[in-house]
Amino acid sequence: MKKMMMLSLMLLSAPAARAQDPSGHWEGSIQLPGREAAFAIDLARTPAGEMAGAISVDGADGVPLASVTVAGRSIAFYSRSDQPLTGTLSEDGAAISGDATLSGYSLPFRMNRTGDARLSPLPMSDAVSRELEGTWHGTLQANGLTLRAMLTVTNQPGGNAIGRVVSVDEGGLTLPVVVVQHGSRVDFEQKGVPGSYSGELNAGGTELTGTFTQRGVSIPLTFTRTAR
Protein backbone atom coordinates (compact mmCIF):
# COMPACT_ATOMS: atom_id res chain seq x y z
CA MET A 1 0.00 0.00 0.00
CA LYS A 2 2.82 2.40 0.87
CA LYS A 3 4.50 1.79 -2.50
CA MET A 4 1.25 2.49 -4.33
CA MET A 5 0.80 5.77 -2.41
CA MET A 6 4.34 6.88 -3.30
CA LEU A 7 3.74 6.04 -6.95
CA SER A 8 0.54 8.10 -6.89
CA LEU A 9 2.42 11.06 -5.42
CA MET A 10 5.08 10.80 -8.12
CA LEU A 11 2.46 10.76 -10.86
CA LEU A 12 0.74 13.78 -9.36
CA SER A 13 3.92 15.78 -8.89
CA ALA A 14 5.37 15.19 -12.36
CA PRO A 15 2.78 17.30 -14.25
CA ALA A 16 3.23 20.09 -11.72
CA ALA A 17 6.96 20.21 -12.50
CA ARG A 18 6.31 20.25 -16.24
CA ALA A 19 3.76 23.05 -15.84
CA GLN A 20 6.34 25.55 -14.57
CA ASP A 21 6.27 28.40 -17.12
CA PRO A 22 8.86 31.22 -16.93
CA SER A 23 6.86 33.60 -19.15
CA GLY A 24 6.83 37.17 -17.86
CA HIS A 25 8.95 40.22 -17.08
CA TRP A 26 11.85 39.54 -14.71
CA GLU A 27 14.07 42.04 -12.93
CA GLY A 28 17.20 41.32 -10.93
CA SER A 29 20.93 41.76 -10.67
CA ILE A 30 24.23 40.02 -11.30
CA GLN A 31 26.79 40.14 -8.51
CA LEU A 32 29.94 41.61 -10.06
CA PRO A 33 33.16 42.14 -8.09
CA GLY A 34 32.44 45.13 -5.85
CA ARG A 35 29.01 45.96 -7.25
CA GLU A 36 25.72 44.68 -8.59
CA ALA A 37 24.60 45.10 -12.20
CA ALA A 38 20.86 45.42 -12.70
CA PHE A 39 19.24 43.68 -15.66
CA ALA A 40 15.83 42.57 -16.90
CA ILE A 41 14.61 39.60 -18.91
CA ASP A 42 11.36 39.21 -20.83
CA LEU A 43 10.17 35.72 -21.73
CA ALA A 44 7.11 34.60 -23.69
CA ARG A 45 5.96 31.68 -25.80
CA THR A 46 5.65 32.11 -29.54
CA PRO A 47 2.55 30.93 -31.44
CA ALA A 48 4.57 27.79 -32.24
CA GLY A 49 4.97 27.13 -28.51
CA GLU A 50 8.68 27.93 -28.38
CA MET A 51 10.16 30.23 -25.75
CA ALA A 52 11.46 33.60 -26.94
CA GLY A 53 12.94 36.44 -24.95
CA ALA A 54 14.98 39.61 -24.67
CA ILE A 55 17.49 41.06 -22.21
CA SER A 56 17.97 44.67 -21.10
CA VAL A 57 21.18 45.64 -19.33
CA ASP A 58 23.74 48.46 -19.20
CA GLY A 59 22.46 50.65 -22.03
CA ALA A 60 21.11 47.76 -24.09
CA ASP A 61 17.32 47.54 -24.32
CA GLY A 62 15.39 44.52 -25.54
CA VAL A 63 18.29 42.60 -27.06
CA PRO A 64 16.86 39.35 -28.48
CA LEU A 65 17.86 36.13 -26.76
CA ALA A 66 19.43 33.72 -29.23
CA SER A 67 18.57 30.69 -27.10
CA VAL A 68 16.11 29.87 -24.31
CA THR A 69 15.97 26.33 -22.89
CA VAL A 70 13.52 25.25 -20.19
CA ALA A 71 13.50 21.79 -18.60
CA GLY A 72 11.31 21.44 -15.52
CA ARG A 73 12.48 24.20 -13.19
CA SER A 74 15.86 24.59 -14.94
CA ILE A 75 16.34 27.42 -17.41
CA ALA A 76 19.27 28.54 -19.58
CA PHE A 77 19.43 31.48 -21.97
CA TYR A 78 21.80 33.87 -23.73
CA SER A 79 22.01 36.65 -26.28
CA ARG A 80 25.74 35.97 -26.70
CA SER A 81 26.89 32.35 -26.74
CA ASP A 82 29.95 33.32 -24.66
CA GLN A 83 27.77 34.84 -21.92
CA PRO A 84 25.21 32.18 -20.95
CA LEU A 85 23.00 32.36 -17.87
CA THR A 86 21.74 29.20 -16.19
CA GLY A 87 19.32 29.13 -13.30
CA THR A 88 16.53 27.43 -11.40
CA LEU A 89 12.98 28.66 -10.90
CA SER A 90 11.78 28.74 -7.32
CA GLU A 91 9.02 26.30 -6.42
CA ASP A 92 6.42 29.08 -6.53
CA GLY A 93 7.71 30.34 -9.89
CA ALA A 94 8.33 33.84 -8.55
CA ALA A 95 12.14 33.90 -8.71
CA ILE A 96 15.09 32.58 -10.70
CA SER A 97 18.56 32.21 -9.23
CA GLY A 98 21.69 30.90 -10.85
CA ASP A 99 25.00 31.85 -12.44
CA ALA A 100 26.02 34.07 -15.36
CA THR A 101 29.25 33.49 -17.28
CA LEU A 102 31.02 36.77 -18.09
CA SER A 103 34.62 37.01 -19.33
CA GLY A 104 35.18 33.45 -18.17
CA TYR A 105 33.95 34.11 -14.61
CA SER A 106 30.88 32.50 -13.06
CA LEU A 107 28.86 35.17 -11.24
CA PRO A 108 25.66 34.66 -9.21
CA PHE A 109 22.42 36.32 -10.23
CA ARG A 110 18.86 36.47 -8.97
CA MET A 111 15.66 37.72 -10.61
CA ASN A 112 12.06 38.21 -9.52
CA ARG A 113 9.01 38.02 -11.76
CA THR A 114 7.31 41.43 -11.73
CA GLY A 115 4.60 41.15 -14.40
CA ASP A 116 3.86 40.24 -17.99
CA ALA A 117 6.51 40.07 -20.71
CA ARG A 118 7.26 43.30 -22.58
CA LEU A 119 8.53 41.95 -25.88
CA SER A 120 8.49 44.22 -28.93
CA PRO A 121 7.67 42.85 -32.39
CA LEU A 122 10.53 42.38 -34.83
CA PRO A 123 11.07 45.72 -36.62
CA MET A 124 10.39 45.66 -40.35
CA SER A 125 11.94 47.63 -43.21
CA ASP A 126 10.58 48.50 -46.63
CA ALA A 127 11.62 46.06 -49.34
CA VAL A 128 15.11 46.64 -50.74
CA SER A 129 16.59 46.18 -54.21
CA ARG A 130 17.82 42.82 -55.42
CA GLU A 131 21.35 44.27 -55.37
CA LEU A 132 21.12 44.89 -51.61
CA GLU A 133 19.18 41.81 -50.56
CA GLY A 134 21.40 39.03 -49.24
CA THR A 135 24.31 38.46 -46.85
CA TRP A 136 27.19 40.89 -46.40
CA HIS A 137 30.42 40.58 -44.41
CA GLY A 138 32.58 43.34 -42.94
CA THR A 139 35.25 44.00 -40.32
CA LEU A 140 35.38 46.74 -37.68
CA GLN A 141 38.62 47.98 -36.13
CA ALA A 142 37.78 49.41 -32.71
CA ASN A 143 39.79 49.87 -29.49
CA GLY A 144 42.55 47.65 -30.80
CA LEU A 145 40.10 44.86 -31.59
CA THR A 146 39.07 43.35 -34.90
CA LEU A 147 35.37 42.51 -34.91
CA ARG A 148 33.66 40.69 -37.76
CA ALA A 149 30.14 41.80 -38.68
CA MET A 150 27.56 40.07 -40.84
CA LEU A 151 24.57 41.93 -42.29
CA THR A 152 21.58 40.07 -43.72
CA VAL A 153 18.65 41.69 -45.51
CA THR A 154 15.77 39.49 -46.66
CA ASN A 155 12.70 40.69 -48.54
CA GLN A 156 9.38 39.33 -47.30
CA PRO A 157 6.05 38.75 -49.01
CA GLY A 158 3.94 41.88 -48.77
CA GLY A 159 6.61 44.46 -49.52
CA ASN A 160 8.65 44.38 -46.30
CA ALA A 161 12.18 43.29 -45.44
CA ILE A 162 13.88 41.92 -42.33
CA GLY A 163 17.39 43.09 -41.48
CA ARG A 164 19.81 41.71 -38.93
CA VAL A 165 23.43 42.35 -38.01
CA VAL A 166 25.55 39.70 -36.28
CA SER A 167 28.68 40.49 -34.26
CA VAL A 168 30.50 37.25 -35.03
CA ASP A 169 33.29 37.74 -32.48
CA GLU A 170 30.96 38.81 -29.66
CA GLY A 171 29.31 35.47 -29.14
CA GLY A 172 27.25 35.78 -32.31
CA LEU A 173 25.21 38.64 -30.84
CA THR A 174 22.35 39.20 -33.30
CA LEU A 175 20.50 42.51 -33.45
CA PRO A 176 17.59 43.63 -35.62
CA VAL A 177 18.17 46.59 -37.92
CA VAL A 178 15.81 48.86 -39.83
CA VAL A 179 17.19 49.35 -43.35
CA VAL A 180 16.41 52.35 -45.56
CA GLN A 181 17.57 52.39 -49.19
CA HIS A 182 17.44 55.36 -51.55
CA GLY A 183 19.09 54.32 -54.79
CA SER A 184 22.71 53.53 -53.99
CA ARG A 185 22.52 55.07 -50.51
CA VAL A 186 21.93 52.60 -47.69
CA ASP A 187 21.29 53.42 -44.04
CA PHE A 188 20.38 51.19 -41.15
CA GLU A 189 19.48 51.76 -37.53
CA GLN A 190 20.52 49.07 -35.07
CA LYS A 191 18.03 48.12 -32.35
CA GLY A 192 18.73 46.76 -28.87
CA VAL A 193 22.27 48.13 -28.72
CA PRO A 194 21.91 51.56 -30.38
CA GLY A 195 24.04 52.23 -33.44
CA SER A 196 23.68 53.35 -37.04
CA TYR A 197 25.29 52.86 -40.42
CA SER A 198 25.40 54.99 -43.57
CA GLY A 199 26.98 53.77 -46.78
CA GLU A 200 27.00 53.65 -50.57
CA LEU A 201 26.38 50.56 -52.68
CA ASN A 202 28.73 50.29 -55.65
CA ALA A 203 27.46 49.96 -59.21
CA GLY A 204 28.23 46.24 -59.31
CA GLY A 205 26.26 45.54 -56.13
CA THR A 206 29.28 43.83 -54.58
CA GLU A 207 30.48 46.35 -51.99
CA LEU A 208 28.86 48.62 -49.42
CA THR A 209 31.23 51.34 -48.21
CA GLY A 210 30.34 53.54 -45.26
CA THR A 211 30.58 54.41 -41.58
CA PHE A 212 29.23 52.77 -38.43
CA THR A 213 28.42 55.17 -35.58
CA GLN A 214 27.86 54.26 -31.93
CA ARG A 215 27.92 56.47 -28.83
CA GLY A 216 29.25 59.39 -30.85
CA VAL A 217 32.17 57.43 -32.33
CA SER A 218 32.27 56.79 -36.10
CA ILE A 219 34.29 53.93 -37.60
CA PRO A 220 34.79 53.04 -41.28
CA LEU A 221 33.00 49.82 -42.20
CA THR A 222 32.91 48.20 -45.63
CA PHE A 223 30.68 45.21 -46.35
CA THR A 224 31.27 42.81 -49.22
CA ARG A 225 28.61 40.52 -50.56
CA THR A 226 28.59 36.77 -50.11
CA ALA A 227 28.37 35.09 -53.51
CA ARG A 228 24.77 34.33 -54.42
Task: Briefly describe each language-model feature range.
Residues 4-13:
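Sec-dependent N-terminal signal peptides
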Residues 15-19:
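Sec/Tat signal peptide C-region and signal peptidase I cleavage site
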Residues 20-92, 97, 101-103, 120-203, ...:
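Central antiparallel beta-sheet cores of small beta-barrel/beta-sandwich binding domains
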